[in-house]
Swiss-Prot record:
Function: Binds the 23S rRNA.
Source organism (scientific name): Geobacillus sp. (strain WCH70)
Protein's name according to its UniProt entry: Large ribosomal subunit protein bL31
Gene Ontology molecular functions: metal ion binding; rRNA binding; structural constituent of ribosome
Family: Belongs to the bacterial ribosomal protein bL31 family. Type A subfamily.
PANTHER family membership: 50S RIBOSOMAL PROTEIN L31, CHLOROPLASTIC (PTHR33280), LARGE RIBOSOMAL SUBUNIT PROTEIN BL31C (PTHR33280:SF1)
GO CC annotation: ribonucleoprotein complex; ribosome
InterPro entries cross-referenced by the UniProt entry: Ribosomal_bL28/bL31-like_sf, Ribosomal_bL31, Ribosomal_bL31_A, Ribosomal_bL31_sf
Quaternary context: Part of the 50S ribosomal subunit.
Gene name as annotated: rpmE
Top-level lineage group: Bacteria
Keywords: Metal-binding, Ribonucleoprotein, Ribosomal protein, RNA-binding, rRNA-binding, Zinc
Co-factor requirement: Zn(2+)
Cofactor: binding details: Binds 1 zinc ion per subunit.
Length: 66
């Protein structure tokens, strides 16, 4: 690596839209994110599963398959 051409990597505070803050590393001074592990549905357990069973039943009914 050439000296003096790389940006300085430093610790920064990452702020989420939900109000959560955590520390990470970046070359930027400040990071803002819309969603984090504290408010994302996958991590909070509020995830909704979309069931395709209704569409499959409709297809089978339409084409006479079992």
């Amino acid at each position: 690596m050439k000296p003096g051409i790389h940006p300085e990597y430093k610790k920064v505070i990452v702020r989420c839209a939900c109000g959560n803050e955590f520390e990470s590393g970046s070359v930027k001074d400040e990071l803002r994110v819309e969603i984090c592990s504290e408010c994302h549905p996958f991590f909070t357990g509020r995830q909704k599963f979309v069931s395709a069973a209704g569409r499959v039943d409709k297809f089978n009914k339409k084409y006479g398959l079992k």
